[in-house]
Amino acid sequence: MPKQVDYGSRRRRIAEAVCVLADEQGPEGVSMRDVAARAQVSLGAVQRCFRTKEEMLLFAVEHVGERVTERVRARIAAGPAQSAATALGHATDEVALLREEHRAEARIWLAFVAQAAVGASLAEPLRNSYAALQDLFVRLITEAAASGPGGGAADAFADGPDAVREARTLLALTDGLTGHVLIGHLTAKEAEGVLHAHLAGLWARLGVTGPEAKG
């Protein structure tokens, strides 16, 4: 009986190899042959999963985005009794990729962003990842506003636009801090301070007692 191949698992394994190589030499330097060698599979196995290098890179971008999003959701689910404010703090911690164990992932993500700026095909999965995170931020900000006292800024968030604006601002800040830490302009601790200060301002505008966004 022929051996059954788990193509989902193989595609993820190949995506991990793509990420390692993209970290070492940038996405533009990744070849299907090198990926096969790094993933310890044949070139034919890679080609059966992905018809072209572009298709392989697209999947790798989606893979990284899904990994970050899943980690954010898992962090939130780990504390079901936590407030929306606490959950948002945990979410921003994960998205910023400031911890040392996420440094390689941060480099890979920014390498794909840089490549997407000159190669439109990679832009769509990146936009999808950012959209999913923005939607999550909108939901948590709206829930946090609802938990605050009635009237004032909190009421404005019930209509949606302000929550979207705040979510966009927070996502842009969180994402931008990743690059500042990678190039050494800020330390991870300094970046966390910037993020916590912004969240404190958000809680003040909402009239919500928010915790510091620490993991």
Task: Give short role names for the model-derived ranges.
Residues F50, A111-V118:
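Short helix-capping/turn signature of helix-turn-helix
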Residues R13, A17-F59:
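Helix-turn-helix
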Residues E101-L110, A120-S147, R165, G193:
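Amphipathic alpha-helical packing segments from all-alpha helical-bundle domains
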Residues E62-V68:
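Short, basic, alpha-helical segments at the C-terminal edge of helix-turn-helix-like DNA-binding modules
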Residues A123-R127, A144-G215:
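Hydrophobic/aromatic-rich alpha-helical bundle segments in the mid-to-C-terminal region
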Residues K3-Q4:
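Short Lys/Arg-rich basic patches
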Residues G79, V113-A116, V181-H185:
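Secondary-structure edge/capping motif, primarily at the C-terminal ends of alpha-helices
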Residues R73-A106, A153-G160, E166-L170:
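Hydrophobic alpha-helical connector segments
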